[in-house]
Amino acid sequence: GGVHSEFTIMRESENSFYLVSAGAFQRLDHDWILGWMPKDGSVQFENLTNSKGVLVVSGPKARELMQRVSNDDFSNENFKWLSAKQVDVGFAPVNAMRVNFVGELGWELHHPIEYQNHIFDKLMDAGQDLGLKPYGIRAMNSLRVEKSYKLVGTELSIEYSPYESGLDRFVHPNKGSFIGLEALNKWREKGFDNKLVTLEVHETSDADVLGNKPIYENGSVVGRATGGDFGFRLGKSIALGMVKPELANIGQKLKIDILGKMHEATILEESPYAVSYTHLRAHETRIH
């Protein structure tokens, strides 16, 4: 009844699907899918991890940059949020997905690994006057906690039900059977012990929450911080964590242990940065 993994799925053709999951879990996901494959050979499955690369283009000028490096149409009307298309970047074939993990307008560019240097150079050359800069996984983590985006292995886990992790809108027990439904229904009858919240951590001058830190209320452990970082767009230290459902209220005061020091923390609304998703669903008028 928990969350085993998370996938982005692109339908490439009538009977061909391209699946993307967390790189660190590729072996686990590969074996799990194989275990559910029909035994009659009607479905073929291939692990492309070692032959594919991914570059992420994100930010308010992402569309302008993509139009410079491709002849395909990246307008909002033609390339809507949460859609995917096969495009060309330079002379490289690319599966472009209008999704990203940072809460800004952007695309994931999935490509044969042998084209990666070509695509990277093409992007960097075309984006010089736009202020384009490379960024790494720690910067991405900072951006994702500002949006309350959930990470497999921390906020999403077999340890927590999808209801506890805030995935209610994706779970429909009455629409037909799915893997884990029976276990999830039993879990619902028993009741849930946790609820995912976003917190502002106060007075963190030299350290932010990294994860697996106890959360306290009146001296008692009432939850666990699953992840965190300093949010530079918000100018605040942000943490995600599981707490007892009765404490999961906006404005609730708690404490988090960071490196042996107690820090005051306040529960915020989910997705404290760009709550309206304006940047994610940006139209051309948002580009500047």
PLM feature spans:
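Short, conserved charged micro-motifs
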Residues: 27-28, 63-64, 115-121, 208-209, ...
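Short beta-strand/strand-turn micro-motif
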Residues: 1-6, 93-97, 104-106, 110, ...
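Short beta-strand-to-loop capping motifs
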Residues: 21-23, 58, 111-113, 201, ...
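Conserved small/polar residues in nucleotide/adenosyl-binding loops
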Residues: 278-287
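Glycine-rich, acidic
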Residues: 35-188, 192
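Glycine-centered loop/turn motifs
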Residues: 26, 77-85, 208-212, 251
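Extended, compositionally biased flexible segments
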Residues: 1-16, 21-39
